[in-house]
Amino acid sequence: MDIQLTYNRRTTTTTTVGGLSIGSEHPVRIQTMANTSTNDIQGSIEQAKSCMEAGAELLRFTTQGMREVESLSQIRTELLKMLHDGSALFNVVPLVADVHFQSDVADAAAQVVEKVRINPGNYIDPARKFKQI
């Protein structure tokens, strides 16, 4: 079955996540989210490898607190080690921290991964602190 779809893309601006260009004339990107505990470092690495080998271009991890930020740092380090020692059958893709409610966690995660995903609605409570950058 040969299905031809035509559509007009909205005009957007290019942005980059790590070395990956998104938007504008660039192709739609494949993003997935790990379903392992971010603190299960070895399990997360194995799942990341599987996702990247299957073609994922962005990989998101839930990041509830500082412990997960540290785990993400270790995951990133191990994936890069595999790439540099030649044992990887994949290219390391940008990692994304999925953060809710905690601006300090988002700030810390931004030092570790290429992208931090937040829900801005989570930050509207004036009782919560948010650092102006």
Annotated model-derived regions:
Residues V17, S24-G43, T62, V92-Q102:
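Active-site mouth loops of central-metabolism enzymes
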Residues S44, A48-C51, I75, A108-A109:
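Generic structural signal for hydrophobic
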Residues T63-V112:
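N-terminal active-site wall of soluble small-molecule enzyme domains
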